[in-house]
Amino acid sequence: MAPKGKVGTKGKKQIHEENQDTLKFYSRIILGANAIYIAVNLLLFYNSSSFWTWFSLMFAVAVYVGSYRSMSAMAKPAFAEDGSLLDGGIDLNMEQGMAEHLKDVILLTAIVQVLSTLSSYFWYLWLLAPARALHLLWVNFLGPWFSADSQAAPEENEKNDKKQRRQERRQMRRF
């Protein structure tokens, strides 16, 4: 049974500690994926590495740097002059937040990067990121904007509502 009442809020100290743990976890994922990719593609199979091997590594590093820096900027705490914590930063573990999407991008890139040691075709899976971004853009912004009624529509809706009410009254009289 679900607990009744409001969900408890986190304190700024707890948010700060969880943010530090989250950043540490994702930095380990980034370092691990890069280590595996470099060990396999650039050390073990150095003779068969090409421009695309280096390009994909640079692409992954750029994605990692952008995502990780954004997350660390969001989680940056504010301290008072005496060293006490004023603000723990934005909660990186908050559901439906921007940090959730950044974490997904890091995980997708790490998975694709490690799988690409088996075949370069796994890089096509990275197309899931822009597809997800377009889906979110459509669902949250473009779809509602295109399906919104125009300014002239409320007048027509009032006329149609009046006609509908008249027809309902007539039907009620008949029965």
UniProtKB/Swiss-Prot annotation:
Superkingdom: Eukaryota
Per the record, membrane topology reads: Multi-pass membrane protein
| Keywords for the protein's UniProt record, in alphabetical order | Autophagy, Endoplasmic reticulum, Membrane, Transmembrane, Transmembrane helix
Q: Where is this region: Disordered?
A: 152-175
Q: Which GO terms describe its cellular component?
A: endoplasmic reticulum membrane; intracellular membrane-bounded organelle; vacuole
Report the record's Gene Ontology biological process terms: autophagy; vacuolar protein processing
Cell location:
Endoplasmic reticulum membrane
- Residue ranges crossing the lipid bilayer per the database entry: 25-45, 51-68, 105-126
Name the residue ranges with Basic residues bias. 162-175
What's this protein's family per the entry?
Belongs to the TMEM208 family.
Q: Do you know which PANTHER family this protein is assigned to?
A: TRANSMEMBRANE PROTEIN 208
- Its job: May function as a negative regulator of endoplasmic reticulum-stress induced autophagy.
Q: What name does the UniProt record give this protein?
A: Transmembrane protein 208
Gene that specifies this protein: tmem208
